[in-house]
């Protein structure tokens, strides 16, 4: 396998949503840095394809699929897979999530509850399951937030998504406080407009794409690999004095 600085050598990293663009890119990036990766996804085929990609590149990875992270039992089973296979958990990257978009007057009670379960509850359940083992390893948690937690866009009916991701940033700050005595660092990442499976259909609308790119200083979409690079920084000792914060990866959208 082509390696970089081996910044995660000997580390066991649990990454959720490895069937997606960012999850797959992160699994490969972490493996190239020496990590043993434990992935999961609701999509059996996509998750299996990522395992095959990582192993073909010479990396070490196992995966649980399908895995419903809104089910506490599945979260416990995922952590047990990591412990059974590699004996420890050093890094938890809560990347997975499903978004539902609708305006206030159109969103249903069921959609609101479903959005919360698939953006907030799953982070709580899995972090709770991993916490005793992260205490033992003085580990790291990285949570996936969103630029929507701090910005609103007139073209995007993101009430539930905005609310949930703001909650993730708050949860991150609280977890960092609770983890401080155990050497656990907790941070989050807020991506802007990243080309991924989740955004590709939105980008097919020229008006929407033009409006969003027009608010980006760098004038282009972000790449999944660019988010993975930030996740690597937060997961590694390179960020040993960083905790309780949110890092924005948005090409300058927030400041313009």
Residue ranges and their predicted role:
Residues 12, 19-21:
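Conserved glycine-rich cofactor-binding loop
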